[in-house]
Amino acid sequence: MNQKKPPVSKPPSKFAQWLSRASGSLWLRTVKIVAGILLVVLLVFYSAAALFTDQGGFTVSIKDAGKGNAKYGAISLSETADFASPTVRLEAQEVARMTNISELDIPADVDNYDGAHNGANYMAYTFYLKNSGEAACDVLTDLRIDGVVKEADEAVRVRVYKNGVPTTYAKLAADGTPEPGTTPFEGGKKVLSELSEDLAPGEITKYTIVIWLEGNDPECLDNIKGGSVKMSLMFSVVEDSETQSET
């Protein structure tokens, strides 16, 4: 019985060789392109993550605490409405690495939590102010910027909830007009100065402070990468002439 000879393999044609080399070269170029795209994406992500490194600090305090007339000047702070641990100074947690967001990214219920409840890209802090004295008093609220690096305050937003009512503050735009939906800073490094009159004995005011970097602000540019903002909120009892005569 005759056996068939095994087929003789023919060497690949020149076209097949060229096609093989072309396919390998195309695959290599594709890999390089994909790797390049991934590198760009990672660099963009890193730049965004480093946009607002070490955001700064935020403190709340009472001016000249303990130096005034205890009857009229006794106001205190607490992170809880029951004032289980009253104090004259509070400090919010910092946001270590903060990138720009939109105000639409702020949760609708951000005012519903006590103490520090930061998001990934915003600072949120809720506390309470109480008149612990024996008579009504006027309280001055002074919110100011204590330090800025790389002009980060140009695009910062500060939203203050007072008993659930929000007001958003921002620096004036480059053309001198208010940023949309905001109340301008009072000037310089002062964000706001507000007098609350006739705070009754035992009356409690709830505050929530939210701070973020507004990505829709035209001033939110690359030059503020790595910037920071440090702010403080101070309360003080304003004594009228009658009160001063009694002290």
Question: For each of these PLM feature ranges, what is it?
Answer:
Residues 135-145, 152-155:
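Short, hydrophobic/aromatic beta-strand segments
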Residues 143-147, 234-236:
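Acidic (Asp/Glu-rich), glycine- and aromatic
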Residues 2-106, 116, 239-247:
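Short, polar/proline-rich extracytoplasmic segments that appear immediately after membrane translocation
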Residues 105-137, 189-247:
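C-terminal, structured domain-capping segment
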Residues 141, 157-161, 239-244:
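Short C-terminal domain-edge/linker segments immediately following a structured domain
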Residues 55, 153-155, 226-232:
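Short edge beta-strand segments in beta-sheet-rich domains
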Residues 62-91, 148-189:
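A surface/secretory-pathway sequence property marking extracellular, secreted
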Residues 21-35, 101-112, 166-204:
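Extracellular adhesion/glycan-binding regions together with long Ser/Thr-
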